[in-house]
């Protein structure tokens, strides 16, 4: 009789304290032994020789648009794409599904879809808007991992921005609930006026868009949100931080004891404004991609541990919504399949960024911050979530490689070094050699209180 359900043998295992060659034994979906050599047999044995075994990534920021906007993306296609990139879990945003996740009814509607269709594990953000302050308690009871708010227009009329009163009262409530708030930080008045002025003068190109959302709009708003968090005691996460100066504000606040973190997104590390001019609307996002000097500074902040985690901000749409003048088209980038490969290429190979830190940025920290118990690292008692990686395999991303509903991404045609050959969720292989090999087995993740 097999002693274990699964043994991974001979892998280079990316543990929290370093990379070491080891075997990993799994029973009942959990890691039960990590040793240089594990004797005996198992129901399944995987030879990971020559591979690096990473903890499966958790993407803290995706828009899978389900239910209600399934012509853009679905939980089925989005979670499959995530698995193909080494992903085992995601936290889905309260928009751009329709209706938005602003109360228990719509939370449960989304949960029902995920229970049926999600290949990987999932958590859900609740929304905080000026219209649903009375719904925060019921969303907390549903098990949201936190709340998301926009300081500027969200792009979705049914998800109104958080004004200052909502910020104050909402953060006071969330502090009592013990749940974090993530804020999209851009100054509403400045972005609105600059955008309207640009459109009135028929300035609708790439650089016009950048000029309408300059760095100060993020920097100023990050400073203000930190002040609200400091006064209320609410845990704050700055979403998709794009400027090094804003990262510095977060680091300074943390140094004085404020419970604040920031996430960044791959495109702020890999792309510059020049790339956006070349790529066009497929690379439009908000906040916009910045210049090369800021990008270099962002890498410095990553090396200095001032950025807590890296997500994809996967925000697809119907490709028709990307047709037209840059200023007017939908802003959002499809990227959840390439987060780990991007970091292996641009961080590890190009900049000698440690593999352990990549695992922290994509798996460990996000689960710790959101209090997801037993997930995010290769350690005893944790979920047996693994991404098997060939560090030196080079490939050019093709549209047909993508599992998204629409085979669109600014990274199509890019050369990557470091590929995912197999993804394992709680001991079950869900992706292998370019194919999804499992039925949906995702489970709902709730914060551990």
Swiss-Prot record:
NCBIfam families: allantoinase (TIGR03178). Belongs to the metallo-dependent hydrolases superfamily. Allantoinase family. Homotetramer. PANTHER family: ALLANTOINASE. The modification N6-carboxylysine is found at residue 148. This is Allantoinase. Its EC number is 3.5.2.5. The lineage of its organism: Bacteria, Bacillati, Bacillota, Clostridia, Eubacteriales.
